[in-house]
């Protein structure tokens, strides 16, 4: 009799995805970030669910409900700290995952890649609406500034902003709908992640060489199930360490002050994981131009497969493209730093240069280098 995991309609899907899945034998630790993202999502949904049991989405009580969670709810402080810092780990894993895809040419699985970009946008949206919920100063002013950007769209802009606010300013209606979105979107992300996996399993995983690995596959379990488990343990150690020892390290002190529409904080800035995009937004003096640059800073990822010119898949054997890749990484770090600085000389100029380099690398330098490497190797 055949094994139940191979015959049962539900179990055979799980079996095909996590047990008997043929995986390349040489995928490195860079291939762990995908499963870590799954772990992050589960952690965030669970901690978020328990927080939602005690949170009230009303401007008069939101801030104090979080104080209540941290003071009076059993382990509420821990649940909140894990949820707040879990978001940071989520984005660390996301950026590593995208970087791996870019370095090794995994973006040539176009459906998987494009759904991945959609997942990135959904996660950014979820994190943004989530940051508004504590109703601190940075929550309120962040919501005001970022939603206000939509008013840059010609003709419909102002109507659009008021429609999102549910009134003429960021108020109770805004907080209530943001809570609704923040509760709903993670489940949309979970659904999209399943589609992401479905498309990935149509082709199988890429590997560090970028060559076809059909001749050398191993079963996912036990090899990569244990490798993933090691990643899980290491990440959870990191997450618990930061949640227990310095939970406010990555937060903004302004958010410990309840929202006050009459007092603007000296520096309005988002959480660290959005600073690179915020720097690109601020580097353009025109409002609509800034908004479009902000959108395109993420959507440019969708152009990466189209702009792939090399005859080789990954950057493993391409030293010139490697230099450009690490230049892009350095450039993103510079943008992240600039995003947290005040709008004054020399930061404005550095931000504009870094933003120009960011788009030039994606749209000009990487495609040209791929073409050049083909020429050098006489691969016409």
Curated annotation (Swiss-Prot):
Gene Ontology biological process terms from the UniProt entry: mitochondrial electron transport, ubiquinol to cytochrome c
Binding site for heme b b562: 83, 182
Protein localization: Mitochondrion inner membrane
GO molecular function, one term: ubiquinol-cytochrome-c reductase activity
Keyword field: Electron transport, Heme, Iron, Membrane, Metal-binding, Mitochondrion, Mitochondrion inner membrane, Respiratory chain, Transmembrane, Transmembrane helix, Transport, Ubiquinone
Cofactor(s) recorded in Swiss-Prot or TrEMBL: heme b
Topology relative to the membrane: Multi-pass membrane protein
Superkingdom to which the source organism belongs: Eukaryota
Residues at which a ubiquinone binds: 201
Cofactor binding note of this UniProt entry: Binds 2 heme b groups non-covalently.
TM annotation in the entry: 33-53, 77-98, 113-133, 178-198, 226-246, 288-308, 320-340, 347-367
Binding, heme b b566: 97, 196
One GO cellular component, as annotated: respiratory chain complex III
Described function: Component of the ubiquinol-cytochrome c reductase complex (complex III or cytochrome b-c1 complex) that is part of the mitochondrial respiratory chain. The b-c1 complex mediates electron transfer from ubiquinol to cytochrome c. Contributes to the generation of a proton gradient across the mitochondrial membrane that is then used for ATP synthesis.
Subunit structure: The cytochrome bc1 complex contains 3 respiratory subunits (MT-CYB, CYC1 and UQCRFS1), 2 core proteins (UQCRC1 and UQCRC2) and probably 6 low-molecular weight proteins.
Family, as annotated: Belongs to the cytochrome b family.
Additional record remark: Heme 1 (or BL or b562) is low-potential and absorbs at about 562 nm, and heme 2 (or BH or b566) is high-potential and absorbs at about 566 nm.
Name of the protein described by the UniProt record: Cytochrome b
The gene coding this protein: mt-cyb
């Amino acid at each position: 009799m055949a094994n139940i995991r191979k015959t049962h309609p539900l179990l055979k899907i799980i079996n095909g995805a996590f047990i008997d899945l043929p995986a390349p034998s040489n995928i490195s630790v860079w291939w762990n970030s995908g499963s870590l993202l799954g772990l992050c999502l589960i952690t965030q949904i669970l901690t978020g669910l328990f927080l939602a049991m005690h949170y009230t989405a009303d401007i008069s009580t939101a801030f104090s409900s979080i104080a209540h969670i941290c003071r009076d709810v059993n382990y509420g402080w821990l649940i909140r700290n894990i949820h707040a810092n879990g978001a940071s780990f989520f984005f660390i894993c996301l950026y590593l995952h995208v970087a791996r895809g870019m370095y090794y040419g995994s973006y040539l699985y176009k459906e998987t890649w494009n759904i991945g970009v959609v997942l990135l946008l959904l996660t950014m949206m979820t994190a943004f609406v989530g940051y508004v919920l504590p109703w601190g100063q940075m929550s309120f002013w962040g919501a005001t500034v970022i939603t206000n950007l939509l008013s840059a769209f010609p003709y419909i802009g102002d109507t659009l902003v008021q429609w999102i606010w549910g009134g003429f300013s960021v108020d109770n209606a805004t907080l209530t709908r943001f809570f609704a979105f923040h509760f709903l979107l993670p489940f949309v992300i979970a659904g999209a992640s399943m589609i992401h996996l479905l498309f990935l399993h149509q082709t199988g995983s890429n590997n560090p060489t970028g060559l076809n690995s059909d001749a050398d596959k191993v079963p996912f379990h036990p090899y990569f199930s244990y490798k993933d488990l090691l990643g899980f343990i290491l990440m959870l150690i990191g997450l618990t360490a930061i949640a227990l020892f310095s939970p406010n390290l990555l937060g903004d002190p302004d958010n410990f002050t309840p929202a006050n529409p009459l007092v603007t904080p000296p520096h309005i800035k988002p959480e660290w994981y959005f600073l690179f995009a915020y720097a690109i937004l601020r580097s353009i003096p025109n409002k609509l131009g800034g908004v479009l640059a902000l959108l395109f800073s993420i959507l440019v990822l969708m152009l990466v497969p189209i702009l792939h010119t090399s005859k080789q898949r990954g950057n493993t054997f391409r030293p010139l493209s490697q230099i450009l890749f690490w230049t892009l990484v350095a450039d993103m770090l510079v943008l992240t730093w600039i995003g947290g600085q005040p709008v004054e000389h020399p930061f404005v100029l550095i931000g504009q240069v870094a933003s120009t380099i960011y788009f030039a690398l994606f749209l000009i330098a990487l495609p040209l280098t791929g073409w050049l490497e083909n020429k050098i190797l006489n691969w016409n």
